[in-house]
Amino acid sequence: MNRTIRVSAAGDILIMKRLLPGYQDVLPIREFLMQGEVRMANLETTISDGSCYASAYSGGTWLTADAKCLEDTLRYGFNFLGISNNHTMDYSYEGLASTISELKKKDVAYAGAGKNLYEASRPAILDTTAGQIAVIDICSTFENAARAGSQTERQPGRPGLNPLRFSEKYTITEKHAQDLAKIAEVTGINGLRDLHRQEGFIAPLPEGVMEFGGKMFEISKDGTEGRSSSPNPIDVKRTVDAIREAKMTCEAVLVMVHSHEIRKDNDEEADYFLEEFAHACIDAGASAVIGGGTHQLKGIELYRDCPIFYCLGNFIFENQYVRLLPADYMEKYGLNIHTAASIGIARRQEQSSHSLYEIPEVYRSVLPYFEICQGKCTHLELLPVELGMDRENAEKNIPYVADEKTAEKIAEYLTSVSKRYGTEWEYKEGRIVLHA
């Protein structure tokens, strides 16, 4: 029997305050999302009452929101929230436990983090009229202490997120390699790592590879120079195995991935390792890969008739409304540790030469609705949304259905960033669709 699986999705939900009482666009957005039986997004904050210990690190800003904000998030109709992102461990193990507890209270399916690596990498299972759908969530942007660890027969696992590690390699000419070697010699930049390598604490360098400041360089054989990246084979295998296992009992598998990495010097191109990972997921049997992270849209690829959304951008982006920040943040920006969070955020804005809040693309996104039959995408449409860049402060940073002029700009931009994947987009009758 050929069953049709209906999925709708949104990007990153960084919610810090309640939705406005008079906010009406929740209704048409909810109506669009409710077409899907699986309705998914990334929850890019912890949920707590603010009493959890802050980690010594954060995903950029320490984020935690009240449970009432989670209630408002669910007004859009989401029944799955990914929790694997660079803010998962902003408030340490206690913050993660609080987030999971609140999601369970609301009976919301989640994946991407847990008490150990098994739980963090385990898919959520959603029941639909087409059968059970598995959703895996994974993240490539994190402090190493944030990743979940495996349990053994001797020790418990470590709470954290489901990690997608990756390696980078820089290819340079022989002349540039000699220059780096000379700089390393006179500065001692590699001294400690060289010593640790001799003592066996760091693995030996592969043949033909040199290190400089923790980065790996390979001498080019043909004179070309550049950067490449590849996903960690252990993390790829764990994910591929989870996809294949889920396919044994589920009608479809979806993979959500959170990644802030970039290919060169802008947020428009997916990193090399992310493309390789997404393709591996589809090759293993996943029906779609849904990405987030870089706060603006990336390209959409149809790979083997399955959609890959490399980044859906923002759905709610209220980073400037953070209500609590630890002393670590204030010290970083030269402020008294008792300074109010709003002043701390303002200080960071003052130091920025290219603020996210001044970039139109940060305020524009799409919500995909797609249908899957026999593992392939048979229908795909996008609802263009904007986050109120030109509205009053109280109305900013939450989604509104885009007007025709803005929607056409979104379609044009999406075509530009999707060019490498051969997909073109046009705005037609309130939706963005593939150009015929």
Question: Where are the regions a protein language model picked out?
Answer:
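Acidic, metal/ion-coordinating pockets
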Residues: 1-436
